């Protein structure tokens, strides 16, 4: 009999992840509050159920993919009364470190194996099954979770104990936000100096300016054919999600006493970008703000 997995949160990331578990041979019982998400998951072979309790009733493992820390705490508190002590719990949401550690603590009394395992790779990686998982929890929990995670991704990095996965995700995405702002500024400067996009790309992509924000998610059309800039900035990773992660980084910076002035500046830029109505665009579209081309977007 196939291993049964309860999957809570079938949205843009969770839905494709659950579908990949089905493709890998798992029986997946899924729950989401949004009917459209449930319908999409059901079409991919997920057995959609009406409650969280139904999703985890026979589950040997539970995966949660939820919007924020408060949602994870609420669901994991409920799970403490629903799951067996042998159940493996994996949270793939991107949340603050304190909430991640609290979630682990909620299940400590049940002696369940727990893991925070946020992801990198965006919706494209979720659909393709190429996500990277940043795992926080015991070595035993990570080892038990590995076959499940490998059905949804290509790389698993155990970053440390409880909360370490979230810490790694926040730090990584602060790097991404800062580097994208820097790449965009460089293209804006090049435009003013009469240097073509292609020329700058060819130099920077093979020199010390090389980075993912340039070579994979290039913010101008042309140099990287598959980048969102060539598709009207439809998001692979939205500006709103980048802002969420930058805010989490700033919260962590404040609570830990770390100095992150560039992260703070990036958060301010993306905050303004979202306030102007562009949060649904790819985060590389911040280049329009840096060009001074944006006014408030109206529906």
Each language-model region and where it sits:
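Rossmann-fold NAD(P) dinucleotide-binding segment
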Residues: 52-114
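Helical "substrate-binding/catalytic lid" subdomain
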Residues: 165-265, 269-294
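Rossmann-fold dinucleotide-binding core
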Residues: 5, 10, 75, 94-173
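NAD(P)+-binding Rossmann beta1-loop-alpha1 motif at the extreme N-terminus of oxidoreductases
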Residues: 1-65, 82, 86-87, 123, ...
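Methionine-biased hydrophobic packing positions in alpha-helices, especially
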Residues: 13, 17, 65, 92, ...
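Hydrophobic beta-strand scaffold residues
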Residues: 28, 48, 114-115, 156, ...
